[in-house]
Swiss-Prot record:
Limits of the F-box domain: 65-111
Assembly description: Part of the SCF (SKP1-CUL1-F-box) E3 ubiquitin-protein ligase complex SCF(FBXO33) formed of CUL1, SKP1, RBX1 and FBXO33. Interacts via its N-terminus with YBX1 CSD domain. Directly interacts with SKP1 and CUL1.
Pfam entry (one): F-box-like
Gene3D superfamilies from the UniProt entry: 1.20.1280.50, Ribonuclease Inhibitor
Transmembrane segments: none
Keyword set, alphabetical order: Ubl conjugation pathway
Annotated GO biological process: positive regulation of protein ubiquitination; protein ubiquitination
Protein name: F-box only protein 33
Higher taxonomy: Eukaryota, Metazoa, Chordata, Craniata, Vertebrata
Pathway(s) where this gene product acts: Protein modification; protein ubiquitination
InterPro entries per the UniProt record, alphabetical: F-box-like_dom_sf (IPR036047), F-box_dom (IPR001810), LRR_dom_sf (IPR032675)
Parts forming coiled coils: none
Length: 555
């Protein structure tokens, strides 16, 4: 379990007025008195009778005899507030009294937890949430399912079985692992929700569930979920707890739920009071597993969220009526919109209700800083042509394909329509056969990626895998954008060379490519050698969710 906590440092109040200056002076005098008392107390503890040598006095501070354990809790918390997180944890190990003061609410305003879906995480999570769940103001939890498809676990046979019988055994073992990870996932989610059900201080609440690995085997809810939770009691309990948290909240400004298995329902947001909904600043509800025409939020429900600065939804749920609601005079201008376009949603939901070009123009008129981030999973070119309206202020776009490849025409369209806005362009193709990547420049006079770099003058990130990138075009991209292109990630297997470059015996083509691209960018560059190290490829859902969070916060 990875844990990130913020350490609040005391700051004086503002001094813009005479009264403010007086408050600052009083605050500084008070802090100085506190520090003097603290130094005096430490000197007394060092110099008390029987303390012995200077070394003994120093060492005794950590022991019961020196009186460190008898310090008032307020003073210990005050000492903790000056320490960075690692030192704070080490200091709490001195005695039980100091450990009791470690979880004082003022010391833990934020909790950011990344959990492996493993039974070993449960006792640690229970301890932490029992200590902090009732008062924490910002809680971000990510559930990371291990890739059980890789197999090879201890005692699983290690691939020794062959033939039909071996395949059946492997399928049974794989099924058992799916059931175990799903059962653990539900328990961990319950642990988090139970601990914060009565927390009225909660201001930011973010949940991410990495269930994409599980869904690779098909319809998760119809197979493994029915075995783990046959009567649906746990799922219903989780949904009720989530709604209870929303109904009990009084200060919630940020609600984000992405790819969490059947936690959010179409009726969940109705649990929020009007007072909380009216002050909500960020809302993201991402779940491509919702069946049929169901949506997690409707245009009528969105009317209550008059203070939204950022919004993240499934593209098929973002309708023309929603765009109209967001442009109403009683709504504050929307600054950031993140949209997930998934082939599963497109197959089950219609694109007929999506905003037209006039709706996008109205949103841009209401806020000149309005920007859009789109993530597209396996979307056909004809559908992308419908989605990419000219007036969308598209700043970031991420293509992730398994079956359907992006065409050169789509890349060319993006470079022409969004040249004033585009900063991030990601092109990922998870193909099994790496011997023949699609070539976007095929039958074209100019390479679409080079044109993208030429037209989009704000481009700062370009990542490509699974598409042929010619070495001379890569050099051209680096020279066109120069040092403004902060990130250029291209996998080694995606790069190809002309026969003329390979035939030149005097020049090493790979070395020349690295040298020329580095010169163009003004910084050292090399191709991505190990695709597994590229998180945008191995964990596209998590990458999109984290980027969506930072995109929404960057206002």
């Amino acid at each position: 379990m990875l844990l990130f906590l913020s350490v609040p440092q005391p700051r004086p109040p503002g001094a813009r007025t005479r009264a403010g200056a007086a408050r600052v002076a009083r605050w500084r005098r008070l802090r100085l008195q506190q520090l003097r008392r603290l130094r005096g107390l430490l000197r007394v503890l060092r110099g008390r009778p029987g303390a012995g040598s200077r070394r003994r006095g120093r060492m005794a501070l950590c022991g019961q005899a020196a009186g460190a354990a008898s310090l008032p809790s307020e003073l210990i918390v005050h000492i903790f507030s000056f320490l960075p997180a690692p030192d704070r944890l080490r200091a709490s190990a001195s005695c039980s009294h100091w450990r009791e003061c470690l979880f004082y609410p003022a010391l833990w305003p934020q909790l950011r937890i990344c959990l492996r879906v493993s039974p070993a995480e449960q006792p640690r999570l229970e301890f932490l949430m029992r200590k902090c769940g009732w008062f924490v103001r910002e809680l971000r939890v990510e559930f990371a399912a291990e890739n059980y498809l890789s197999g090879g676990g201890p005692g699983d046979g290690g691939g020794a079985d062959t033939g039909t019988g071996g395949e059946e055994v492997e399928a049974l073992q794989l099924s058992a692992r799916w059931l175990e990870v799903l059962r653990t996932y539900l328990e961990l989610v319950l642990c988090v929700l139970v601990s914060i059900r009565n927390n009225r201080n909660l201001q930011k609440f973010s949940l991410f569930g990495d269930i994409s690995v599980l869904q690779q085997q098909g319809s998760l809810s119809n197979t493994y979920l029915s075995k783990v939770d046959p009567d649906g009691k746990k799922i219903k309990q989780i949904q009720q707890l989530f709604e209870e948290i929303l109904s009990n909240s009084r200060q919630l400004k940020w609600l984000s739920c992405g790819f969490m298995l059947e936690i959010v329902t179409p009726t969940s947001l109705s649990s929020l009071s009007n007072a909380v909904a009216n002050t909500m600043e960020h809302l993201s509800l991402l779940d491509n597993n919702i069946p049929g025409n169901s949506t997690l939020i409707t245009a009528v429900e969105l009317e209550r969220f008059v203070n939204l600065h950022s919004l993240a939804l499934d593209f098929c749920d973002f309708t023309a009526e929603m765009a109209r609601v967001l442009t109403d005079s009683n709504h504050v201008p929307l600054q950031r919109l993140s949209l997930l376009v998934h082939n599963v949603s497109v197959m089950h939901k219609s694109l007929d209700n999506m905003p037209n070009d006039e709706h996008w123009k109205a949103l841009s008129r209401k806020s000149t800083s309005f920007r859009v981030y789109i993530m597209a999973f396996d979307i056909k070119s004809e559908d992308m042509l419908k989605i990419l309206k000219p007036s969308i202020p598209l700043e970031r776009i991420h293509f992730d394909s398994y079956i359907t490849c992006v065409s050169g025409a789509i890349v060319d369209l993006i470079s022409r329509q969004y040249d004033k806005f585009l900063t991030h362009f990601i092109l990922m193709n998870d193909v099994i056969d790496t011997s023949g990547f699609p070539d976007l420049s095929d039958n074209r006079n100019e390479d679409p990626l080079v044109l993208l770099a030429w037209r989009c003058t704000k481009l700062s990130l370009l990542a490509i895998h699974g598409y042929t990138v010619w070495a001379h075009n890569l050099i051209a991209i680096a020279r066109l954008r120069g040092s403004d292109l902060k990130v250029l990630e291209v996998t080694e297997e995606s790069i190809d060379f002309d026969q003329g470059e390979l035939a030149d015996q005097d020049v090493d083509p790979v070395h020349n490519l690295i040298e020329q691209v580095s010169l163009g960018l003004g910084q050292p560059w090399h191709a991505v050698m190990d695709i597994e190290s590229l998180s945008v490829f191995t964990e596209p859902n998590r990458h999109f969710y984290r980027e969506m969070q930072s995109f929404s916060e960057d206002i």
